[in-house]
Amino acid sequence: MNNFDDILEQPAEQEAPAQENPKRKLEWWQIKEQKQRKEAYATLDRIFHEFSEGKGDVQGYLDTHGRFDRYSARNALLIHEKCPNAKQIGNYKYWESQGVDILKTEKNNPIIILEPGNTYRRKDGTTGQNYYAKEVYDISQTTAQGQEQPKVALDERLLLKALIYKSPAAIHVVEQLPDGRRGALYQPEQNSIFVEKGMDAADIFRCVSQELAKAQLMAVNPEQLPAECGNKAFCVSYMLCKKYGIDTR
């Protein structure tokens, strides 16, 4: 057993647009926000259409979402569309608090994301969520450009332990997977993930993260088959690898 196998053997709807009162005269900033919000939704509609036709930059989006995993998928799409190489974003007040200024040439070129606002009652009695447009800027649009945050070296054992913490399926290390498979395999009938013995940390992270994603997706929707959530699981694994510096090869 190598230095990593023992770790694995441990118990282990588009929202409705914000409702405006047509009788109320809007201020200039409200008109601006309304325009930005409509443009953001139009951008998302275009991106979704491109994805549906197999023309969108899916890998680029996943790269961006891997860096901004705390943002919604929708906002990650908007960030990627406007600034695909974005590393660190914040609104005007955030950068001001950091002692950083927005470049004059970039002040009128913000990244627009959608933030939740007030809820409202629909005609059918259900509750809806309003969203408003928010201006943010990447560090490359500020006087702090080029001052990237240093990368933190992560301990491989701790990273693997974090990956399998509260796993939705039992994990077992085996000498060989069935049918000559390599890496890892989720078996829903046994609710177990079987992992090939002897892999290095990067290989373990890549294959186990994908099978963990399958297990979690099937826990949410038990009716689907492992093959039906394969693409989603791959995307989850890819983003995790990008986030933690694991080669996605």
Kindly give the residue locations of the regions a language model identified.
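N-terminal accessory/interface modules of nucleic-acid-binding and processing proteins
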Residues: 1-249
